[in-house]
Curated annotation (Swiss-Prot):
Lineage: Bacteria, Pseudomonadati, Pseudomonadota, Gammaproteobacteria, Enterobacterales
Part of a proton relay during catalysis (site feature) positions: T44, Y107
Database matches in Gene3D superfamilies: Aldolase class I
SMART domains: DHDPS
Main location: cytoplasm
Coiled coil: none
Family, per entry: Belongs to the DapA family.
Protein name: 4-hydroxy-tetrahydrodipicolinate synthase
Entry's EC annotation: 4.3.3.7
Residue positions binding pyruvate: T45, I203
Pathway(s) the chain acts in: Amino-acid biosynthesis; L-lysine biosynthesis via DAP pathway; (S)-tetrahydrodipicolinate from L-aspartate: step 3/4
């Protein structure tokens, strides 16, 4: 469940900014039909930063309800404060989630020792499998391979979503961690290269609107068939890039609406609607990818 194509699911909202159950159910069914391996609920792409903790919990629980055991659900549980991350993680322990994705604290920029103590405390006070999440471009701090290696010795810290886009990282981490520690890409544009170097999958933004294609890329890659994997990935390269012309999830929500997966591409401030110039690039990318637009 923690290998292959895992979608970093968008959070569909109605025009008033409230959660749209109908669109969420449609998205979940789309991923089940496309054989996506698992769903990450309320990560960066799910707009965790603009949701209250009550909304955060309710959306994860609704996702579990709608998934109904048909696809594993991973809950985003990262927080700036260690006590809050522990509390949120414990909230999901009896919920049925398959595991948690825990981003490094952001804005307060802890040292490597601070990061180690943060994740150590979460591990020692909770039971769910934990996937570390390193995305320095957003958080302002970088979880270095040596710190990852120390954390890999905790039994419930099972892997890392590495979203630096730096492919040299995978070699450094692989040399230092135990052999069963999962290495998952968090960067669609370099995910295939990441897997060729020994990674086990990707937590993907692109999968929101190209679920079948991302599943096929990962499936081929994990079998060692990089010829077929690259053939599909080549069609998606413009899309991988276009989805980050503006901050995620602005572009991907607009495209999800464009192809009929959600009713509205509503975002909460300070996120604002996609620019006309970006729409042009997204339409070009979706045409090149040969994905159907409704």
């Amino acid at each position: 469940m923690f290998k292959g194509s895992i979608v970093a699911l968008i959070t569909p909202m109605d025009e008033k900014g409230q959660i749209c159950r109908i669109s969420l159910e449609k998205l979940i069914n789309y991923h089940i039909a496309s054989k996506t391996e698992a769903i990450v609920s309320i990560g960066t792409t799910g707009e965790s930063a603009t949701l209250s903790q009550e909304e955060h919990i309710n959306i994860v629980m609704l996702t579990l309800e709608l998934a109904d055991g048909r696809i594993p659900v991973i809950a985003g549980t990262g927080a700036n404060a260690t006590t809050e991350a522990i509390s949120l993680t414990k909230r999901f322990e009896k919920s049925g989630v398959a595991g948690c994705l825990s981003v490094t604290p952001y804005y307060n920029r802890p040292t490597q020792e601070g990061l180690y103590q943060h994740f150590k405390a979460i591990s020692e006070n909770t039971e769910l499998p934990q996937i570390l999440y390193n995305v320095p471009s957003r958080t302002g701090c970088d979880l270095l391979p040596e710190t990852v290696a120390k954390l890999s010795h905790f039994n419930n810290i099972i892997g890392i979503k590495e979203a630096t886009g730096d492919l040299s990282r995978i070699h450094k981490i692989k040399e230092l961690v135990k052999t069963n520690f999962l290495l998952i890409s968090g960067d669609d544009a370099t995910a295939l290269d990441f897997m060729q170097l020994g990674g086990q999958g990707v937590i993907s933004v692109t999968a929101n609107i190209a679920a079948k294609e991302m599943m096929e890329i990962c499936s081929y890659a994990l079998k060692g068939d990089f010829i077929n994997a690259r053939s599909i990935n080549k069609r998606l390269m413009l899309l991988h890039e276009a989805l980050f012309i503006e901050p995620n999830p602005i572009p991907v929500k607009w495209l999800a609406k464009k192809i009929g997966l959600i009713k509205s591409d509503t975002l909460r401030l300070p996120m604002t609607p996609v620019l006309d110039s970006t729409r042009f690039q997204l339409e070009k990318a979706i045409q090149y990818a040969n994905l159907k637009i409704s």
